[in-house]
Amino acid sequence: MTTTRHVALAVAVTGASAPQWRVELRAGAHQLVADEPATSGGGDAGPAPFGLVMSGLAACTAMTLRMYAERKGWTLASIDVDVRYNVTDDGAASIDRTISLPVDLPAERRDRLADVAERTPVTLALRRGVPITTTIRP
């Protein structure tokens, strides 16, 4: 028997009185704002939706690598993750992720962390694709 467990919840709210594309978000106990940049007609009050998705991937990558390194007893002065969502003229999409680790990190540890990065929860969800069920309520 398959068991489904709730992993994350996010709620987005906007209304006629909200500035152009601004949306108030709630993720657990945290409140955020999403918006479009001024160049797209928004007020640039927060990240655009794809920025939020890419931020989630970057955060999950950095957190997972840090957890792994700490469990192994490895000291990492920093982990920087740069994620870019790209779309070609014909609509093909790709994500480029660049992870910067300390220069003095031994090659075998660097290789192991590269392998771990390929299996973070958000990486796997994006790669596998996730079925989305939409319900419209009054």
Language model segments and positions:
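Extended beta-strand/beta-hairpin segments
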Residues: 1-54, 63-138
